[in-house]
Amino acid sequence: MIYLCSDWHLNHDRTFIYKARGFDSVNEMNAEIVKRHNAVVKSEDDVYCLGDCCMGADLEANKKLIESLNGKIHIILGNHCHASPRRVAMYQQCHNVVEVVASAMIKLGKQQFYLSHWPTITGNNDADKPLAARIINLCGHLHTYDPWTDIDKGLIYHVEMEAHNCSPVLLDGILQEFKDKEAWLK
């Protein structure tokens, strides 16, 4: 199985992050994100976190949190990651992290997905083509509660924690949502 998420912001001790998600403390948020993640993700699953995985100077605490997550973790760098080479190095040392990259392309069947931290316009000029011939951008960054926030700009779907009740999203489910809306997307 392939899961996606973005903007865990583990250990980000700012009320505008954890309070907005309905938590009373950063520790409560951390514990609940790990719990919800591990409730659906198994050790053999692939998980793409599309940026801003953790915050704070305590890299060892961040490493322990990431290593407590099930699955083979693929990290797409976010805006908080690029500024911290030490954080990137910590990600690379986590036993369950299999790659740390700026962006990625993956496929599910014939459907291509472009994974990035920031929403990326994949184009509306191919709206006459079938869905399988188009590229879907999966992203984060905005902390939106609506995964379809940018659909007017292209085939863009948000996987932030806020949009999915602080849980990872199954790639098969995302593709099915697009198929269900295919006529509407033209």
Question: Residue ranges of each PLM-predicted region?
Answer:
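Core catalytic region of metal-dependent phosphoesterases/phosphodiesterases
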Residues: Y3-C5, L10-M105
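Conserved beta-sheet core of the metallophosphoesterase superfamily
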Residues: Q92-K186
